[in-house]
Amino acid sequence: MAEKFDNLEEHLEKFVENIRQLGIIVSDFQPSSQTGLNQKLNFMITGLQDIEKCRQQLHDINVPLEVFEYIDQGRNPQLYTKECLERALAKNEQVKGKIDTLTKFKSLLISELGKVFPEEMAKYKAIHGDDPPS
């Protein structure tokens, strides 16, 4: 899978470099540079065809639209991954806190119910085990 991405990256780098050179030729166009311009245009077409071939190999890859928004805003797309991981970590900590609170509540509830309803709690503990989770 990595070689597919490497192949695409290589073709994209070549394409961008060709476009850069094409821009230089066009910005200072002289009739004598027509042959070079035609050659660069043909390279551009070939580059697009190569990229299209790579696209067909990567058709099953899904990229979140937010990544493209980051790129459009001039931001590093790796920041998207970092921020997603940070949000997941924060949510994980929040859920862990809720679980810990509910576990403590269950333990306290079992303890208090044992004081009020000792016979019923003895049956409960016989079915579910003597040690409530703490």
Curated annotation (Swiss-Prot):
Metal-binding in keyword set: no
Gene Ontology annotations for the cellular component aspect, listed alphabetically: mediator complex
Regions annotated as coiled coil: none
Pfam families (UniProt xref): Med10 (PF09748)
Keywords, alphabetical: Activator, Developmental protein, Nucleus, Transcription, Transcription regulation, Wnt signaling pathway
Function as written in the Swiss-Prot or TrEMBL entry: Component of the Mediator complex, a coactivator involved in the regulated transcription of nearly all RNA polymerase II-dependent genes. Mediator functions as a bridge to convey information from gene-specific regulatory proteins to the basal RNA polymerase II transcription machinery. Mediator is recruited to promoters by direct interactions with regulatory proteins and serves as a scaffold for the assembly of a functional preinitiation complex with RNA polymerase II and the general transcription factors.
Family indicated by similarity: Belongs to the Mediator complex subunit 10 family.
Subunit structure: Component of the Mediator complex.
Protein name, UniProt field: Mediator of RNA polymerase II transcription subunit 10
Gene assigned in the entry: med10
